[in-house]
Structures are given as structure tokens and as C-alpha cells.
């Protein structure tokens, strides 16, 4: 399957302020020379500012933005008819899968990976139907698993340490004991607490 070059680039890039600092300092030097230079320094300062500004813009434009990467995920969801927003009576949990995935740190410092999971919870009398989609962002493939769980089940959050190139991170999973069902979740989402609250009855 053809890989998405933009997704590949995003997952491989490492955001460092090095070039921003270098080109920003170059612009600052040019401005100082412009105001305090004399003779050829005055004209040379204009060239320094132009070079520094151009380098700064090129360094920034060479990056794949967080919005571009999230846009790829949104397109995959839409192309496969996967709902991003919950309908009435449903809850949708979404999270990046850190375990066994290529992990990167975005421009906004948030950790993201090459695999994205959504789980749709549809509650009815006595049971809950769960439809979980796992997306491989680079190749655009989607797998789907469907489960039916009684509302008497008592789910729990399990945390696992996962080693990445950015150090150790937590992989949180919503687990239904004795079922083999494990759903990656973002525990910062209030919807996770709401899902747990609806079980154990």
C-alpha cells in the first residue's frame, strides 16, 4: 500500500529550536548593524536581515504542522465513514496508540504516533456495543473490531510504560477483565470517566 509521504515526514521530524535561534539571531544582528553600523555595515545589514528572514521562513515551512497531520487522520476517518463526533446516547473515545508505534513530538509538544484508535460506545438496555477502529496513518489502512459487553462488567484503566525515542511514556488502556478487550484511551478525557461510570450495574 502506498505510504503517505506527509505522515512519514511528520513522524520522522524532530522539532528543535536550533535553526530558529540561528536565523533569529541573524535577523537581530542585521537590525543592530542597520541602526548602529556605518559605511558598508549599513548596506551589509540589509543583506543579513534578508538572509536571516529567508532562512527562518524556510526552516518553518519545511516542517509538517500538527494541523496537517491531524488533517490526514480526519480524511482517513471521513473516507472510511468513521464518526468523529458522538451521536446522542453514544460516547466516542480516541487516542494515539504509543505501544509498538512510531512516536513523535509535535510542534505543540504533544506526543503523537503513527497509529490512532477510536472506540464508539453505544449503550442500550443491559449491554453496550463497542466498535473500535485502529488507523495506520502512514498507509491509511483501517482495522475494525466489534464487541458486545454486558453493563454488569467492571472496566478498569491499566497503565504500561512504553519506551520511545523521547523517553518513557504511559500507555493507558481501558480493559474489560476476562474478555480480552483492551482499548487505548486518553485518561485526560472526561469521556473516559463517563464510560466507566456507565458500567458495573
Roles of regions detected by a PLM:
Residues 19-24, 32-50:
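Hydrophobic alpha-helical transmembrane segments
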Residues 134-138:
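Short, surface-exposed beta-strand-loop junctions and turns on beta-sheet-rich folds
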Residues 121-125, 159:
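Generic beta-strand structural signal
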Residues 2-15, 53-121:
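Anionic N-terminal interaction surfaces
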